[in-house]
Amino acid sequence: SVKDRAALYIVRDAEAKGLLRPGGRIVEGTAGNTGIGLAMVAKALGYKATIVIPRTQSQEKKDAIRLFGAELVEVDAVPYSNPDNYVRYSGRLAEELAASDPNGAIWANQFDNVANRQAHAETTGPEIWRQTDGKVDGFICAVGSGGTLAGVAQALRAKRPDVKIGLADPYGAALYAYYTTGELKSEGGSISEGIGQGRITANLEGLTVDHAYRISDEEMLEVIYDLVEHEGMVMGGSTGVNVAGAIRLARELGPGHTIVTILCDQGARYQSKIFNRAFLTEKGLPIPSWL
C-alpha cells in the first residue's frame, strides 16, 4: 500500500488546493506501481488517468494500469537528462491536457510532490511505531521517489532521534555514492524496476541516512527466492532489495535490534522477468531449482 497511500495523498492535496476539478485528469510518469495506485484512486474518485511508463517495465504492471481504465502511454527508457524521459514527458503531457481537456488535468509529479513524503510521515511511519510498540532500532528501504524513506525517517526520528535510517540501493542508481561520498554517481545496472534514483528529488531534500548499502541483482534474487521457498511469499524486486538491505543493517547493528523494512511489491507483477527462466538465462542470473 506504500504507493496507494502516496497516490491518495497526492490526489487529496490537489483537491484541497483547487487544482483538480470533478471529472479532471491525473497525469503521471511512473515505473509502474505508483501508476497502478493513481489509476485505482482516479477510478474510485471519478477522475480520469493517463499514465506514462517506460516500455521496458513488466507487462503485468502495464496490464494492471489498464485494468483500472487508465490510458497508458509507453515511451523509450532514457535518462532523466533526456527531455523524453518518462517523468519529463509526463509533465509536458499534463500541460497539454490541462489546456485541451474540458475538465482540466494535473501532473501528479510523485518525485517532487512532497504530498508523497507527507503520506508516509503521517501514516506509514506512525503505523511502524505503533506496531513495534516503539521498539524500532532501524528502518531501511530502497528509493524511487524517496517518499517512503524520507517520510518514515521523519516520523520515526520525531519519536526517537537515534533510530538508524538506511538506504538499500540497486546497482545503476546514484544514491549509494551520494550518501557515502557526497557525489551523485552510478555504477553498473539492475533488473529491478521502480527503484534506483539518479538525483535528489524534492521528497529526498534534507534527508540524512546513517547506513547505505549497494545491493546486486544476485543478492536481491537470492532473497526473493528464499522468501518463496521458506516463507511462502512471492514478492518483487523492490522487496528483494529492501530485505537484503535489512539483513545487512541487522548484521551491522548486531543481535537484539529490531529492523523494519517494507515488502512493497507482488511477485505476480514480475512473472515475465524475475520468475522467467528464459529471461534469467539471458541476463546470466541465478535460477532457482524449483522454477
Q: Where on the chain are the PLM-derived regions?
A:
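PLP-dependent amino-acid enzyme catalytic core
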Residues: 1-291
